[in-house]
Amino acid sequence: MTSGPHNLEDPIVRAIRQKNQAPSHDFTIFVQEDGSSVSTLDRVVKNVQAPATYIPTDVEFFDINEPDKPDLHFLRNHFIREGRLSEEQTLYIIKKATEILKSEDNLIEVDAPVTVCGDIHGQYYDLMKLFEVGGNPANTQYLFLGDYVDRGYFSIECLLYLWALKIWYPKTLWLLRGNHECAHLTDYFTFKLECTHKYNIKVYEACLQSFNALPLAAIMNKQFLCVHGGLSPELHTLNDIRMINRFCEPPTHGLMCDLLWSDPLEDFGSEKSNKHFIHNNVRGCSYFYSYQAVCTFLENNNLLSVIRAHEAQDVGYRMYRKTKTTGFPSLMTIFSAPNYLDVYNNKAAVLKYENNVMNIRQFNCSPHPYWLPNFMDVFTWSLPFVGEKVSEMLISMLNICSKEELYETDLKESAPTQHKQPAPSENENKADQEIDIEARRQIIKNKIMAIGRISRVFSVLREERESVSELKNVSGTQRLPAGTLMLGAEGIKNAINSFDDARKLDIQNERLPPSNSRRRSTDLKAFEEVMNSSEDDTSIDHLVERFADKKSSL
């Protein structure tokens, strides 16, 4: 009797053939830890619009009624959704606005009523809030005091929208130059990287040309000198500003530098020294100016006050000591970037001047999309974390390596070869053995030290990834408090308890950046220190000596 084909079938094949059908599962539904279900086809936070991933056509870009001007309403909403323009559209806005800026004087004259605004620093979503508080640019005159770019991650959107407004309202929207509107700072901070990430180097270079065209100061209502930084020992009359050749990269000293970089003294109004100007050691360039220096300048030029930006303020503004002759504040600082760098927790403000009445309007920060540091993608950002853990695993594996495992390795290495060699003498054998032991000991040392260096490099890279706010520790150790880095950005925010803490932490980033050659030298030195730091690591040293001695003695 012959067996049928089913009787000869392998039990495993039969089990596969007769397996129960898998239960149906809807992969478009994801069950969260709390038991709630969400669709994988929908946005989890539905009230946040999806990013605009398309480049607009020229029909969308240009206004219907004014075909040579960009559509402001479209631009505003497109940038809110993180949309980008074509290279041609971007350059059109920059170049057309630059032509208007070039035609303006170094010292422009602005009548009242006007709304004066301080630093913006790439906080586009807060800029939209500013216009809600300050008024529609279509029927409100604005004077911006500079620093539109850097530090924030939406600088190019701020620039393009403000430049588009300048095209529409060339006689009612005024833009002054800040210290960040230059090649040196935008290369050092984030703006150049942002331009090349979102657009290309051609757009960045067009922005630099536009920065050189920005006016340096303004006389508002024939009463107020408005400028980004402040006064200078070389500034005696308003004609001194008019005589500057502004169409260049700002120098590191002189009148143009001081207009962009100078600050009032910390004890402004209660100075113990009679000096009008002293070196600004906080900025690394320019000067601190005194109350008496401001009063003297105002009297000599028949002005009421100086209005400037340049310094973050806890409540968005600061009024300084009043002059003896007019009883009006000699100096005012206005800052319009709320919760600066997402860690300062400060309010922002704009100054509205109308009918000889000055009002301060404050506002808080608005939600905005999150960017990883330096516009990194999540895979690049996570590599140092993975690398650090892998190197830690290698060191841990060395720590649990047993003497028997080392002995087995020795037996394999010392296994006899097929070719017979003449037997060496006893002295030669002993000398060769000592040389071989020392050589193997050095090889082991080098391998473990290499792992230590790799571990240290990944550790430093990981700390840089987590230090998203570019802040340095106030204690001067260049490291955040113990445990803070393990909590990432939230840990950094929690470690900063006040506005003053944030300013102290960020003080190094307020200085004039070093030159490119000095930066390269500093980076090289820092890399060498990182590579050498493993040699000073006692745990690595102990591991090296223990295993080198153990293995060489077997």
UniProtKB/Swiss-Prot annotation:
Binding site for Fe cation: D119, H121, D147
PROSITE patterns associated with the record: SER_THR_PHOSPHATASE
The keyword Transport belongs to this UniProt entry's keyword annotation: no
Cofactor note: Binds 1 Fe(3+) ion per subunit. Binds 1 zinc ion per subunit.
Alphabetized UniProt keyword annotations: Calmodulin-binding, Cell shape, Hydrolase, Iron, Manganese, Metal-binding, Protein phosphatase, Zinc
Feature: compositional bias, Polar residues: 415-426
UniProt: Zn(2+) binding residues: D147, N179, H228, H310
Disordered as annotated region, ranges: 411-433
Cellular component GO terms held in the UniProt record: calcineurin complex; cell division site; cytoplasm; cytosol; mitotic actomyosin contractile ring; mitotic actomyosin contractile ring, intermediate layer
Active site: H180 (proton donor)
Enzyme nomenclature, EC number: 3.1.3.16
Listed PANTHER family: SERINE/THREONINE-PROTEIN PHOSPHATASE 2B CATALYTIC SUBUNIT 1-RELATED (PTHR45673)
Similarity comment text for this entry: Belongs to the PPP phosphatase family. PP-2B subfamily.
UniProt-recorded name of the protein: Serine/threonine-protein phosphatase 2B catalytic subunit
Source species taxonomy: Eukaryota, Fungi, Dikarya, Ascomycota, Taphrinomycotina
